[in-house]
């Protein structure tokens, strides 16, 4: 197989503020695998300060992946090796790269079999689900206005970021969102900003405002404290940063109400399926989340949405210009494509300084704006990359 990669800059439509930082852009690296018949499979990984992945690191890891993938005759054997625990083009300790390699292989395997990914995974029809739409830390007036616009567009689930220095700001923000969109389901995400004492004081107030569940209220690193809080909380508690991989989830199964599975965090589609299987019958339910990424980066998770209680796959909707299309979302619902593979396509962009990206199996080429280099912590600082 032939393997190529491209690095692009993904700019957000507006800066996204969470509890400790603000993000306005990030880099993405696209991996493309090509078979002997000229068909292409694509995967994406994005930079993340929290996971220690800057642009240089991702490019180096993808270069290593290209060398390793070259030893496989076809994507089917590479995917089988990857699912069996072999590196198969991705260092086992870097879940985001493993996820991107797995996505590219699944995309190509699906195209070779003329089958969408969800059918390869056992779902006969294309999964669809309501996705949450994120509202960052902002003034109550702006949050309320945004909630009103989103509800009018069809969004029935809104996720409000919390963790402002003054907790009353969080309460007033949620109050404004609830008043502006009284019928939507509300999720709350402090990104680990609270102490146990603050969480215990605030959660009853958010319950009174009709919040459905709270993600990772406590700082990660003490899953026992999170589990203990979940037992006392008037709201369901969903573990995120404390539920990275399968072993983390097994320790929390039955002790928290949900786990937020992000493919870049756990290692891809098949790792997510193992996590979903591990919590069956435990009382802990699945949430599918994402980093801010393009439709290419989110597409693998969209093929799994029929397995989740909560779906938060709006990362592509936060971009100023999503360079891929094919999973929907603008009306509040994401839907897996029925086209072979991941089912996403490059949007036709043209302009100065753009880099060619191998396109669909018909041999056409798409383009993507070339990145200016690593973010270097300038725009992606602190923990904004958890959004």
Predicted features and spans:
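Flexible C-terminal active-site loop/helix
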Residues: 1-3, 7-12, 23, 291-366, ...
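A cross-domain feature marking catalytic cores of carbohydrate-active enzymes
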Residues: 45, 133-135, 160-162, 188-192, ...
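Structured beta-strand/loop patches that form or line metal/cofactor-binding pockets in enzymes
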Residues: 1-51, 320, 324
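N-terminal amphipathic alpha-helix/helix-capping segment at the start of soluble metabolic enzymes
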Residues: 1-3, 7, 18-23, 110-111, ...
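Shared catalytic-loop signature of beta/alpha-barrel
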Residues: 222-228, 232-236, 243-337
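Metal-dependent enolase-superfamily TIM-barrel catalytic cores that perform enediolate-based chemistry
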Residues: 119-233
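Metal- or metallocofactor-binding catalytic centers and their adjacent structured scaffolds
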Residues: 5-7, 34-112
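Conserved, mostly hydrophobic/aromatic
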Residues: 31, 38, 101, 114, ...
